[in-house]
Amino acid sequence: MRKLTILGATGSIGSSTLSVAQQNSDQFEIVALGAGTNVDKMLELCLEWKPKYVAMATQPAADALKELLSAHAINAEVFSGEDGLCHIAQLDEVDTVMAAIVGAAGLLPTMSAVKASKRILLANKEALVMSGQLFIDAVEKYGAELLPVDSEHNAIFQCLPQSIQTNLGRCDLEEHGVSSILLTGSGGPFRYTDVSELEAVTPEMAIAHPNWSMGPKISVDSATMMNKGLEYIEARWLFNASKEQLKVVIHPQSVIHSMVQYKDGSVLAQMGLPDMRTPIACTMSYPKRVNAGVEPLDFTKVGEFTFIAPDFSRYPCLKLAIDACYLGQHATTGLNAANEQAVAAFLANKIKFTDIARINEAVLHKVCANFQNLELDSLESLIDLDRMARRYADEAINKV
């Protein structure tokens, strides 16, 4: 039986992970749950799952949860802050960690799980975007096991031979006959909207994704296609891919989750309904298969598959991310930080939808001008750069 810590338990990935665990209760035990500040949701989860350990991102949230758990006679040990989340990521009695905390906040807890040699189910793409080679080196150094949860990376993973699956970040695609990786994306809710109308997009419009059920931040990232840009950077590190080996294709139906093209002309694609329980179940049970609770794909109802080249005038954030990928670690760390601040400002109605790309571009230029030669050889140096980029972004937001 696999024993799990779920980081980001109250979010959409956490919910889907618990759904898969419930479908296969004889194979998975929930030992620890970690979350941000959603005390009410965490209380519900504790009442249902009875974890031994819980961690909340802030002390007030942890204190409030302790009080509620005591009132319900639940004996879970409650930790707080980044240290608390890192602690439950490296518990001796846990062998598998679902890393699903959104954004840069997930980096240190995920790295703690790596250093404790856990099986890492990586749903937090920002961890790799922010730390790149440092993360890949740590996985090898500490003997951790890395399995990608993002639907696209999981699809690519499933289309690659086992010798690559067990050597992520250090594989040689060409040696295995791979000519290219085709990263698919839906294009978000505004793929057919006139570009001149994008300035008027509201947060409510942006978070209404046509295919996937996701949290607000990732929904906005999907609308700008920054999400695909971050996934592009993550794919570069996970699969040790060159610029020539990575391509982005818009596929509005979200049925083909990504593809791998081989030298002999073969193309392997992973397909399924747009439901995160499928890639989550794949990683939770790897190399076996378990019931994810997902309806089988009915090809007679799919109708057709459409593929479109991305239009960078519509999706400037995607172009920024692809460019940043080859400028260096300072660029991807800085861009990710800027985007988190810009999306938060948009969701708070402080800036327009189209300002997100402008702020990201301004911060990327500033980071590249000031930190191009900075040696990013530790988590501390990456976090310092992340903070500085957020400061630049906040300054740009205040000028809008």
UniProtKB/Swiss-Prot annotation:
Q: Which UniProt keywords apply?
A: Isoprene biosynthesis, Manganese, Metal-binding, NADP, Oxidoreductase
Q: Which Gene3D superfamilies match?
A: 1.10.1740.10, NAD(P)-binding Rossmann-like Domain (3.40.50.720)
Q: Which residues bind 1-deoxy-D-xylulose 5-phosphate?
A: 125, 151-152, 186, 209, 222, 227-228, 231
Part of which pathway? Answer: Isoprenoid biosynthesis; isopentenyl diphosphate biosynthesis via DXP pathway; isopentenyl diphosphate from 1-deoxy-D-xylulose 5-phosphate: step 1/6
What's the cofactor? Mg(2+); Mn(2+)
Give the family, as the similarity comment puts it: Belongs to the DXR family.
NCBIfam families on file: Dxr, PRK05447.1-1, PRK12464.1
Q: Which HAMAP family match?
A: DXP_reductoisom
**The name this protein goes by in its record:** 1-deoxy-D-xylulose 5-phosphate reductoisomerase
Species the sequence originates in: Aliivibrio fischeri (strain MJ11) (Vibrio fischeri)
